[in-house]
Amino acid sequence: MAHTLLVAGTASHVGKSTVAAGLCRYLADCGVSVAPFKAQNMSNNARATPGGEVGVSQYVQARAAGVAPSTDHNPVLLKPRGDGESQLILDGDAVGHFEARGYYDEHWEDALETARAAHDRLAQSHDVIVAEGAGSIAEINLHDRDLANIETARFADADILLVADIERGGVFASLVGTLELVPDDIRKQVAGAVITKFRGDQSLLDPGIDAFEDRTGVPVLGVLPHDDPGLPEEDSVALPPVGERSVVGDDDAVPDAESVTVAVPRLPRISNFTDLQPLAHEPGVRVAYIPPDAALDDADAVVLPGSKNTVDDLRALTDAGFGDRLRSFDGPVVGLCGGYQMLGEAITNATIEGTGDADRVEGLGLLPVTTEFSESKTVEHVQRNIDGVGPLSGASGTVEGYEIHMGDSTLTGAAARPFDGDGAGTDTVLGTYLHDLFSNDTARDAFVRNTFESAGTVLPAATGRADGDPYERAAGLITDHVDLGPLGLSDQ
């Protein structure tokens, strides 16, 4: 039977996904048969596998482990769409939309059995399972139905590695409080703790570590420096709240002759914003998440991201006057998935996804496209030839990505089809259903080059990502800073 290690956290966004990915790559490099697992994930950043949708972190962890991503790695996925409802995905298939109470009353037992069965299948074919918890393992109001943490620890008989983030302050209070609040049987399964996002002289931290270990008997197995390996973010906790602006990427300097700003409206129900991360790693490129009512005066390009509720997010943009400002904008504009649908003339059957009563919702009107929603959902990995137009002018060859969407879009006027029949493009505007577009060098390089040319700025001499393989960087954080001996992983 496989050895399961549960990477649990004291809170959300403490680094669980990075630690899990690093462990997966480290073990794979050691020749260990390893697989990731997250019993239940709540995220709108999903990826397509042959069996259906999984959370992006488990997709990434599977790649780090050297195994094909599968719905067994994330058997239960909840995708929030707003107004307290989430779409439930079991074993990759969409079941329906539920409020929390409806999910627990109607589908909790199904979800538990689905997760157990997925873990059992993985345990039969791998030596180690690196399971990731969700949020905090100490949510005492949820301990009777905490699938990703408490239930996983129990049905997998997992050792637990507790992860805490020092950047937010109070790291020892978080660790001690978590250990005080978890059930007694779970407390006994905690094999060690890891502190993440540390800056400075670690010797100043050592007295606190000694006091924590004396008080709890739990060893601190490592202190990870504040070093982002560049893995995709799991959920919108990593983004600014709606209404606030935040910049990622080359943001150390004010805009100058060798930099451009790509503006991304921070949609209330944004999804798959990992599509933008490759741009943020380009020299001279800043990705600015802006409120829907923000001006576009300092933007050199605009990318409309995906949305879990395209109709309601379109209404939010329209109500904020974003459409008027976008139609007056003369730089490159790209819409991805839901963003592509918003750029069209209209969306019909809108009540299937939106929360309003209107069957037809007017789009932003930048592309001659109408979208009709239906109950069916497209989930697939795709490979397409690209004939770059507009913002992607100059791109050619083959691109890979994935589609996860409801609705089909139809051309209503003159526009190019840049991807083997998918998408629509004009001189300055392009839309596509293809997620992960900018992970393809030909598409990303063309977009960056065209954005610099449109802005009249100088393209930096250095192009492309220069910070190394993110999987190996994550593994390096583990091997360089964590004592794995007490976890028993070397015995596999």
Curated annotation (Swiss-Prot):
MF annotations from Gene Ontology: ABC-type vitamin B12 transporter activity; catalytic activity
Active-site feature positions: C337, H435
Record InterPro entries: Class_I_gatase-like (IPR029062), CobQ/CobB/MinD/ParA_Nub-bd_dom (IPR002586), CobQ_GATase1 (IPR033949), CobQ_N (IPR047045), CobQ_synth (IPR004459), GATase_3 (IPR011698), P-loop_NTPase (IPR027417)
SUPFAM superfamilies: Class I glutamine amidotransferase-like, P-loop containing nucleoside triphosphate hydrolases
Domain of life: Archaea
Keyword terms of this UniProt record: Cobalamin biosynthesis, Glutamine amidotransferase
One Pfam family, short name: GATase_3
Pathway: Cofactor biosynthesis; adenosylcobalamin biosynthesis
GO BP, sorted A to Z: cobalamin biosynthetic process
Residue ranges of domain GATase cobBQ-type in the record: 259-443
Functional description taken from the UniProt entry: Catalyzes amidations at positions B, D, E, and G on adenosylcobyrinic A,C-diamide. NH(2) groups are provided by glutamine, and one molecule of ATP is hydrogenolyzed for each amidation.
Family membership noted in the UniProt record: Belongs to the CobB/CobQ family. CobQ subfamily.
Protein name: Probable cobyric acid synthase
Name of the gene encoding the protein in the UniProt record: cobQ
